[in-house]
Design a protein with these regions (language model features):
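Hydrophobic helix-coil surface modules that form long, contiguous segments used
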Residues: 1-105, 135, 147, 173
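Flexible glycine/proline-enriched surface loops and loop-helix/loop-strand junctions
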Residues: 28-30, 117-118, 177-184
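Active-site metal-coordination segments of metallo-dependent hydrolases
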Residues: 37-38, 122-130, 183-184
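Short, well-structured active-site flanking segments
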Residues: 56-60, 121-122, 126-129, 145-153
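Catalytic Zn2+-binding segment of zinc metalloproteases
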Residues: 108-124, 139-144
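Acidic/His/Gly-enriched intrinsically disordered linker/tail segments
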Residues: 130-184
Length: 184
């Protein structure tokens, strides 16, 4: 019982890859990064379909929601995505990490890791889906931008981990027991 409901007056950008209809539902004034999102979807579906298993749905869709929250999440076939971390992100500085591309690849990867392959309902289960989605997105990122960009992203993630670890109140658990610790 894991679903999402979104509603709005959307423009829709579409394309197809590997027999899968890719769709991005977006506010009419927020189209600047939509081609980038479609490319990340196309690359992630292509990579994971060949490396792991065919995509299990006929459609993969991203749906914009207002920036009152700042996240993206993967539901079966549908990925709600905040306007603030994708649709209106300024990507003109090409020396920075393309977080729009990476986050889309990561959320698409959850169509395999978390929706096709599920861990048991127990402490630490999120580690499987998150680490495999992370790995998949890193492989897609490396293929698109090269090893140096992937290493730059890993440095960013290391720094994020160290910041989160410094604020941790309950201590660091073994990986098999991690839950609700976003920095890990």
């Amino acid at each position: 019982n894991f679903w999402s409901v979104l509603s709005g007056r959307y423009e829709v950008a579409r394309e197809e890859v590997e027999g899968v209809q890719l769709e991005v539902y977006h506010h009419a004034g927020h189209a600047v990064n939509v081609p980038r999102m479609l490319k990340a979807m196309r690359d992630a579906v292509g990579y994971a379909s060949h490396a792991f298993a065919p995509y299990q749905h006929r459609v993969a869709r991203i749906v914009e929601f207002p920036r009152y929250r700042s996240f993206a999440q993967s539901f079966p076939g549908t990925m709600p995505y905040s306007e603030s971390i994708g649709f209106i992100t300024d990507l003109r500085d090409t020396t920075r990490i393309d977080m729009v591309y990476y986050v889309v690849a990561h959320e698409v990867a959850h169509q395999w890791w978390g929706h096709q392959v599920l861990g048991p309902r127990m402490q630490g289960t999120g580690m499987l889906s998150e680490s495999m989605a992370q790995y998949t997105a890193l492989m897609v990122l490396e293929k698109e931008y090269g090893r140096a960009a992937m290493r730059k992203f890993l440095q960013y993630e290391r720094d994020s981990y160290l910041r989160g670890r410094g604020k941790e109140g309950i201590g660091e658990l073994p990986l098999m027991k991690v839950e609700n610790q976003q920095h890990i």
